[in-house]
Amino acid sequence: MKTELNLHGRSLTLHRFPKRSNETLQAWDAGDEYLINHVEEMALPDHQNIVVINDNFGALACWFSEKHHVTFMSDSFVSHKGAQKNLEDNQCNKVAFLTTMDSIPANTDLVLVQLPKSNRHLVWILSQLRKILPTACPVIAVNKAKEIHTSTLKLFEKYLGETKTSLAWKKHRLVFSQANAEPRIEVDPITAWDVEGEHIQLKNLPNVYSGESLDLGARFMLQHIPQDASINHIIDLGCGNGVLSVKAGQLNPNVRLTCVDESFMALESAKQNLLDNLGEGRDIQCVANNCLDGFKPDSCDLIMCNPPFHQQHAITDHIAWQMFCDAKQILNQNGKLLVIGNRHLGYDAKLKRLFGDKNVKLIASNNKFVILQATKNPAKLSAKQ
């Protein structure tokens, strides 16, 4: 796996985050290279104010910080940590870090965007750029050519302004735009709806997974969250908008709830949804993190988990494996990990490898999903029992 980015006589050493010894995925892609090549050809004067949005692991921030003032904007905690580590390893100049809910800096000279997977997130970003940027400020976005549709360009034209595209290079294409769309459209960051069949209302910020309706996996999982007075602490790992935590809190009014996600927008949404649906005075914590890094071992009774199988645009199962390994460390003895996943992902084999064959059981299944329960080191029953 390549870790050296070599362009224009310069070299950067770049790693994904967290760094793994058997890593098979690069920390940058051809889209990053296309952006770098194009901006270098622009021959900008030094000390420009460049905003970089959705820079997966900091390749763009590292490159442009040598001569310019860079602001890194991302909704991803993992991207923030990856960029910070790569900046440090390459001894780069200081970069400002913001989330995509923060305001775009007003004195921006150039905006570079790796297009997000979510159209809601894209519309939010475009609307914020239109609100702040002067017309003369170039906005250059990149993605795989097959992911840039006519509908994508129409969103640019509607929410940002005049838009055109480049020729394809290494299966990627650039999108050129500027902030001149009229009229300027205000975008509400919150999408709210009721969960059918539940006493739950959810508010979703733009980059929340399945933010416009409840995904089928979560709907199935809601039916199998336990009600158990012996449970003191529940962790919702990869919490999204917090719907599973809300249900767990309704069923277990005295439980301590910890929501963990790598999306800052997901955590803000979960925090608001828990407050709205459970009220004040509950023992609730929302944590931006890479899985369960830094959590105290043997400190939790139940972990609920719906693992993602993407990291940015890459398909990977290493996040699920890290979640399962972390969960085993954090669970108390006899603590339980409740996992939902698509049937084809084979989580049962992974969990049995980690927890032991006899400690993993099927809780429920339908034609698309399975819910599995893994128990940590079940205590042996005494002879009297």
Swiss-Prot record:
Main location: cytoplasm
Cellular location(s): Cytoplasm
EC nos: 2.1.1.174
GO annotations of cellular component type: cytoplasm
SUPFAM superfamilies referenced in this protein's UniProt entry, alphabetically: S-adenosyl-L-methionine-dependent methyltransferases
Catalytic activity: guanosine(1835) in 23S rRNA + S-adenosyl-L-methionine = N(2)-methylguanosine(1835) in 23S rRNA + S-adenosyl-L-homocysteine + H(+)
Superkingdom: Bacteria
Keywords noted in UniProt: Cytoplasm, Methyltransferase, rRNA processing, S-adenosyl-L-methionine, Transferase
Top-level enzyme category: transferase
Keyword Transferase assigned: yes
InterPro entries: rRNA_m2G-MeTrfase_RlmG, RsmC/RlmG, SAM-dependent_MTases_sf, Small_mtfrase_dom
Alphabetized Gene3D superfamilies for the sequence: Vaccinia Virus protein VP39
Transmembrane segments: none
Pfam families: MTS (PF05175)
Molecular function as annotated in GO: 23S rRNA (guanine(1835)-N(2))-methyltransferase activity
Assigned protein family: Belongs to the methyltransferase superfamily. RlmG family.
Main function: Specifically methylates the guanine in position 1835 (m2G1835) of 23S rRNA.
Protein name: Ribosomal RNA large subunit methyltransferase G
Encoding gene per record: rlmG
